[in-house]
A protein has these predicted regions:
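Conserved, well-structured functional cores that handle cations and Mg-NTP chemistry
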Residues: 1-43, 48-51, 217-221
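Electropositive phosphate-/nucleotide-binding environments in soluble metabolic enzymes
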Residues: 21-24, 144, 195-202
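Short amphipathic alpha-helical "interface-anchor" segments enriched in bulky aromatics
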Residues: 151, 155-189
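Short, surface-exposed basic-aromatic patches at helix termini and helix-loop junctions that form
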Residues: 53-61, 83
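Short, conserved catalytic/metal-binding motifs centered on acidic residues
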Residues: 9, 27, 40-48, 63, ...
Length: 244
């Protein structure tokens, strides 16, 4: 389980998940270890927990939590509110349209700071707003829709919600990079300590290459840069020393 800097997709902290437990206590322990003052903590639905919200606020940060079926009552309440057209028209709204290869992605965010009606609002530390993101994917063959709901301790605009919600996807992107470039899903190492160490080294390598790409404004794929580092020691030195 990792903590990432959303804007850059860089991993700056991680913690192992106990085999007899789950990710929730690991996330809470990691939040206590990190300096999160002034940070917006974006977490997936599994970590939409009241204790996680409390720890975040006590650490000086703010939270944006995705609300799904593990919080069924809260999700149902938010869904009923947002799907009421009369209520939705009074929410702050922002829409973006992007073309991704042969797919057009339209995202519309809705945000309201009126949390007075939420029955359990007192249980969520510093709850200040809620929102939803409606995503529509259009291809030549079909059109699909998705709704995602959020709560936050920080008063957000719809534009800010779209920005922060996108950072949640960087975690999935990192998993994809690790599997694509290091075949992590096919790793058969059984020793847990070795697994953790290899995972750290892989993420360090990805971090270094991302930093190099950012500082050099390189558009080259990560795989090409990795291959160059393998063949050229001077390139390897350039990439690994780009932060110094």
């Amino acid at each position: 389980m990792s903590a990432q800097l959303g804007e850059l997709g860089l991993t700056f902290g991680q913690r192992s998940v106990d085999g007899k437990s789950n990710e929730i206590p690991a996330v809470q322990a990691l939040l206590k270890e990190l300096d999160i003052s002034g940070c917006m903590i974006v977490a997936d639905a599994l970590n939409c927990q009241k204790e996680t919200a409390r720890i975040t606020i006590e650490g000086g940060g703010n939270y944006l939590l995705s609300v799904k079926d593990n919080q069924p009552t809260l999700k149902s309440d938010l869904e009923d509110y947002v799907q009421d057209l009369a209520l939705r028209k009074n929410m702050d709204t922002e829409t973006t349209i992007e073309k991704n290869r042969e797919r057009i992605e339209t995202r519309t965010a809705y945000v309201s700071e009126d949390v007075s009606w939420i029955p359990d609002k007192g249980s969520w530390e510093n709850l200040s707003c809620f929102g939803a993101v409606h995503t529509q994917f259009v291809t030549f063959e079909k059109k699909t829709d998705e709704w995602h709901y959020y709560i936050s301790s920080c008063p957000l605009t719809a534009k800010e919600l779209l920005h922060h919600a996108r950072t949640e996807w960087t975690v999935e992107a990192m998993h994809w990079l690790l599997d694509t470039h290091f075949s992590e899903d096919y790793c058969r190492v059984e020793d847990m300590t070795v697994q953790r160490n290899l995972n750290i080294l892989r993420k360090c390598a990805i971090n270094l290459i991302k930093q190099f790409k950012q500082k050099s404004s390189s558009k080259r794929p990560i795989s090409n840069i990795m291959f160059d580092c393998l063949l050229d020691c001077s390139m390897l030195l350039t990439v690994t020393s780009c932060n110094y």
